[in-house]
Amino acid sequence: MKNNLPIIALDFASAEETLAFLAPFQQEPLFVKVGMELFYQEGPSIVKQLKERNCELFLDLKLHDIPTTVNKAMKRLASLGVDLVNVHAAGGKKMMQAALEGLEEGTPAGKKRPSLIAVTQLTSTSEQIMKDELLIEKSLIDTVVHYSKQAEESGLDGVVCSVHEAKAIYQAVSPSFLTVTPGIRMSEDAANDQVRVATPAIAREKGSSAIVVGRSITKAEDPVKAYKAVRLEWEGIKS
C-alpha cells in the first residue's frame, strides 16, 4: 500500500457504471476496491482500466479454498498489477502461506508484490451469528485476534477487521501489521447490512491502518464532495 487514502468500494455492476462514477474525480489519485460483482462481470480488463487511470487497487475476492488452488489463483492475480489482495483467515495457516507463495511467484520481475491481508470476520457478522449459525463459542473479539496472529505468523501483511477490533489486534501483533477496516459510514448515513460499523474519525482514533468506504461516497448526491469529507475526517482535519 503506497498511501493512506480512504479506499472507495466500487460496488458497481459494470465497467461503464464504474468509469462514469470516477469521471468527476478527473485525475485525482484514488485508492479503489474492486469486489466480486464487478470483477466477475468484467474480469481482468477492469483492473487494467483502473490502473491506466493511475488508481491504487484493492482486489477484494476473499479467496478461500484448498492451498494448491489458492496458490495458483494468487499467481494469476499477482500478474495483474494489483496493490492489495485478500484471503479468508478461516482457510488456515497452510492456505495463507500458499497464497503468499503464489503472489511472490506470480509478481513480475522488478515489481513489488501485492500486499496480502486476511479477512477475520465479516462486518455483517455479529456475536449471535457466530454462536447460533457458525457454532463458534469463542467471542468475536477473541476469534478476530486469533485469526490476526495466525495471519502474521503466516507472513501476511495484515487483516480485514472492523474498527472495533483494531486496538485489540495491535496488542497481539507488530505495529507494522495492517488493519484494513470496512463498514465505514459518515455519522448521518445508514448502516444497511453491516453490523460493526464506525465513522472515519472513530477509525482513526482506534488505530485503523486504512478504511474502506462504499455507499457514503458512491450513493452520495455529490460523490466528490462526499469523498473529500470522508478524507478530511479520516485525516483528522476539520472542514
Swiss-Prot record:
InterPro entries per the UniProt record, alphabetical: Aldolase_TIM, OMPdecase, OMPdecase_AS, OMPdecase_bac, OMPdeCOase_dom, RibuloseP-bd_barrel
Function statement: Catalyzes the decarboxylation of orotidine 5'-monophosphate (OMP) to uridine 5'-monophosphate (UMP).
GO BP term (any one): 'de novo' UMP biosynthetic process
Active site: K62 (proton donor)
Superkingdom as given in the UniProt entry: Bacteria
SMART domains: OMPdecase
Catalytic activity: orotidine 5'-phosphate + H(+) = UMP + CO2
Entries under NCBIfam families matching the protein: PRK00230.1, pyrF
Entry annotated with the keyword Lyase: yes
Binding residues for substrate: 11, 33, 60-69, 123, 185, 194, 214-215
Protein name in the entry: Orotidine 5'-phosphate decarboxylase
Sequence similarity: Belongs to the OMP decarboxylase family. Type 1 subfamily.
Pathway: Pyrimidine metabolism; UMP biosynthesis via de novo pathway; UMP from orotate: step 2/2
GO cellular component term of the entry, any: cytosol
